[in-house]
Amino acid sequence: MNINIKQVSFVILGLVIVTIIFGLSKFNIATAAKKDGKKFDDWVVSCTPGNKETKTPEVCLLSQQLNLTQDDKQQPIALFQVGYFGPEKALKMIQTLPLGVRLEAGTSIISSKKLIAPGKYTTCTQAGCQAVASISDADLKTLTSTKENSVAFMNLEGKQLTLPISIKGIEKGLKYIK
């Protein structure tokens, strides 16, 4: 039996290359991962890693926190998170607002004094109450075309309160997480 060293080394090299390519694609090393904490002006990326066992995909959101300064201490009063949800990748905003809100009234995303997206409360925890608002392409266009954006809600006494939302960086951030 006559073994050609060149043929054997060629076959082994080929197997090594195929194994490396398969390994990189299997572990997604070849694709760029989203960076948790990456900033887009007033928005920050926060990602929840995917789980292969439960077939849960990675979810990344843009977050913006509003703080109130009291006695030289910053206290969070609201958290706005924007991201794409579900298989249809629907754009939604999760609004975490302080406790003491009127739940049945819901929330409103307002742009230039125009109501563009109503939000419905889904749950309340010790951290606050969460409302979810669906944002259409037209709503996003309206939001990004003006600097006067806010989320409105009612307190327990029935008084409407509004909190500002900065859209600075949201377009670049949404392209990044999509």
Task: Show which residues each predicted segment covers.
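A generic "folded-domain core" signal
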Residues: 2-14, 18-178
